[in-house]
Regions:
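N-terminal strand-loop-strand
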Residues: 1-17, 45, 49, 64
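Unchanged
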Residues: 23-46, 57-112, 135-140
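Charged phosphate-binding loop/patch that engages nucleotide di/tri-phosphates or the phosphate backbone
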Residues: 115-140
Length: 140
């Protein structure tokens, strides 16, 4: 995870986030995930699986809607550095995830990322004024 502690104007300042980012033009979501992991952690994803999607209406700084594809990387090559331009990179034990400063809503779907159910989850988590309003999901 990245502890977003490097940029004072960061919307995520002080919080822990999974690695990822925005897609480039003409880039599919799997290629975008591999590129973001390579850019942010200097590792190559050898195996990953789509665990779910989340729609975040109203989440952006100006109330923009965000949509995320959540992947679990199960095999990689390389050694991540201690930090990147966004902050410190940390390996976090699963049982410690809920103790970290996270976005309020992340606590609702993190367990779905690591559970034994092979089906992907698809959730919607509206935000208003920087706060989660609700959380609903289904599995397919």
């Amino acid at each position: 995870m990245v502890h977003r502690n490097a940029r004072q104007n960061d919307q995520h300042l002080g919080k822990y986030n999974g690695l990822g980012g925005k897609l480039e033009v003409d880039e599919d979501v799997a290629a975008g995930m591999r590129r973001e992991i390579r850019e942010e952690a200097s590792i190559e994803c050898l195996e990953m699986s789509l665990r779910g999607t989340v729609s975040w209406p109203g989440f952006g700084k100006q109330g923009e809607d965000w949509f995320g594809f959540l992947f679990l990387v199960t095999r990689y090559r390389g050694t991540p550095p201690a930090q990147n331009p966004e902050g410190d990179l940390k390996w976090v034990a699963l049982d410690a995830l809920q103790t970290l400063p996270l976005w309020e809503g992340d606590r609702h779907f993190l367990s779905l990322m690591f559970d034994a159910d092979p089906r992907a989850f698809h959730g919607v988590m509206p935000y208003r004024d920087g706060r989660m309003v609700s959380w609903n999901y289904s599995r397919v």
